[in-house]
Amino acid sequence: MKRFCKLVLATAAVLLLTAVVSVCAAALSGDVNADGAVNLQDVLMLRKYMADLPVSPDLAAADMNGDGAVNTKDLLLLRKLVAEPEPTKPTELNVLATGKIMKITTDFTETFSGNVTGDYSSPANAYLPAGTLDVLKKEVTDPETGYTYYLLGCGRRVYTEDAEVYETSGKLTENKVSVTASVAGGYTTVSLNSAWHVPFQLQLTPQTYPYVNQMGDFGPKYDVTSFTATAVEMTFSYTTYASGMPDVSESPLFSAATWRKNNDNTYTLRLTLRKTGAFYGYHVEWKDNQLVFSFKHKTDISKNTASKPLSGMTIVVDAGHGGEWSGTYGVTSGLYEKTLTLQIAKKLQSKLQSLGATVVMSRTADVKVELHDVATMTRKAKPDLFISIHMDGVDFESANGPTCFYYNEYSAALARSIIANVDATYQKHKETTYRGAKWNPYYVTRVSDCPAVLLECGFMTNAADEALLKTDSFQSELAAAIASGVVEFQKSLP
């Protein structure tokens, strides 16, 4: 028994010594800047590294949980290790704005730049969900259109019909937010607990618009030559305190999340994309006092069979016009646009389904569907893509050929892929003006939930275009070309 006890004690001593040595060896785990100490400076360096700033951390030391990767989980462990202090919370809420408080009443309310009065849509201005509050600065009127807007404290305008008075004489206090993230169901969801329903801005950055100083038919032109964003930035107005670091380590979209305190009573949450341009749409809404962002994942078709390359995808196909919305009409046949769009949309539906996609149609009969209802239907479907079918028409017959329009930056590549295939189909039959992919603020393309395009299949006011467009065989060729563009686009996604 004594010998056994001694053996146990000796073994315990060895284990204890081993544990002490292990602890000592692990003591420098977290020494990200390799200065021999683990402190807040290491936290700061790891934050910078995860925000893609030019720093060179010791990655072995930064791998706090030893899983072979450096991500948000390691940052959380390092913060806990060094007991990083939370920012000082205000003991009293300061009043940041007073006056007439407005409440957004329309879901997905479009916002406009506040430094101009024009009715100019811009993909750089995020929509605001119903329930958002802000102080009214003044009412403004666009002298060209006569439209009226509320200029809000966040610096953007909304149509007067999209907001109502919440308090005739109120105050907005400084806001506090905390954030969490989850990954499920094809989305990365970022949820912010907010003291009240603050306005916010969401931007994809960096992104340049080389023609924005040129005025088109609908104001500044937001055409993009390529989609270059490496991060999503959400800036929250009237916010002086932010806590929590969303864990995005399991997200296929984001590699890091960081907070930035700004000098104008705002905080910015920056989500770094894993790959440049790897962004596929988002949805945002208020759920009680929680602002919920749902960022769409890419539907991976790489393992699909050659005969069903679009399996797993959901695509909304919108047949433009309908009912009393007849659209343009043919110069020789007298056919209405609404008739041809429905014929082509049905053929496209059949083709996409044959390739494995689930297709949601905005209409299947000669009925009028309000544009707002098309957008709502699209959001509810949670699709991978949205395609609206239209016909062009002008006052002179020489204009010819198809055009594909987009609004959001991440829709441009889809427009280019579709128009390349559609134009090639035209060239088999007639020489056609190549009109390409262009930016345009068509209402249905402004949904943010997925890449969305509007295809003008050709000019019904051009006799040669019309002669092709009204034939069953060419409509089938167009449907096949659009579907080919979809497959090529989806395969090309980062």
Listing of model-derived features with the role each one plays in the protein:
Residues S294-M377, A381-P383:
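Active-site histidine-acidic residue metal-binding/catalytic motifs
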Residues L40-R47, T72-L75, R79, L342-A345, ...:
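Extracytoplasmic/secreted envelope proteins and their assembly/folding machinery
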Residues L385-D395, F405, T433-P494:
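Active-site-adjacent mobile loop/cap segments within catalytic or ligand-binding domains
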Residues W325-L335, G393-A420:
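A short, glycine/acidic-enriched catalytic loop
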Residues C5-E92:
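Cellulosome-associated attachment modules in secreted, modular CAZymes
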Residues L128, P143-E144, K308-L310, Q353-S354, ...:
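Extracellular/periplasmic catalytic domains that process cell-envelope and extracellular macromolecules
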Residues S411-K438:
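Active-site-adjacent substrate-binding region
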Residues P87-M313, M391:
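Short linear recognition/processing motifs and adjacent strand/loop elements at protein termini
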